[in-house]
Regions:
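Catalytic-core regions of glycoside hydrolase
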Residues: 1-136, 141, 181-186
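Long, charge-rich alpha-helical interaction segments
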Residues: 107-108, 113, 121-126, 137-179
Length: 187
């Protein structure tokens, strides 16, 4: 039996405890994904960390429904590749037994979703897998000599988000603060 711990039902129960055959699927829909769930200073992320800690103490079967794209506009860059490994390790440390990473399924080429899918597969198989190794394997294998430019593009966006401490939830559109005229010209 599975139940969603989602939005208004996300907080751990105060008095009830799920039976051993009940899966609690905790959803991160309100979170900022530009930073690791655990390392972000936003209130939604702090609340999510508190909630996963609470559920981890009481649920034998804690699963995650995590988000990896902008659902408002699939072609809008969603620079979260540097958080994927940290988040998966965070889930593992908190007794999570199943992870569903919802990405861009309706537009298979939006925002380098194949790269993100490859990296998530590597981290789900081995949470200690190196982020740069996973990224470079895919970029070099798929793009060959052009991979250098793809990696520069990925780093350009991720560096801008990190430098300016930009927060991103899953409903961002093309008017995001990290897509400045300067960044778009460089991209």
């Amino acid at each position: 039996i599975e139940t969603l711990a989602y939005q208004w039902t996300r907080k751990p129960c105060k008095t009830l405890r799920p039976r051993k055959n009940v899966i609690i699927r905790l959803c991160s829909i309100e979170c900022c994904f530009a930073h690791s769930l655990e390392g972000c200073d936003s209130k939604p992320n702090k609340d999510f960390v508190r909630d996963i800690q609470g559920w981890a103490k009481m649920a034998d079967r804690l699963w995650i429904w995590n988000y990896c794209t902008s659902f408002a506009h699939y072609y809008t860059p969603f620079p979260t590749l540097r958080t994927l490994d940290d988040n998966i390790r965070f889930f593992v440390r908190h007794n999570v037994k199943g992870i569903f990473e919802q990405d861009n399924y309706q537009s298979p080429n939006g925002d380098l979703s194949s790269l993100g899918g490859y990296m998530m597969a590597k981290f789900l198989w081995d949470p200690s897998y190196d982020e740069n190794r996973a990224m470079n394997e895919f970029i070099e294998g798929v793009y060959g000599p052009a991979g250098t430019f793809i990696r520069q593009y990925v780093d350009l966006l991720h560096d801008k988000v990190a430098k300016d401490n930009i927060h991103m939830q899953i409903w961002i559109g093309p008017n995001v603060p990290f897509l400045t005229d300067e960044i778009v010209a460089k991209a």
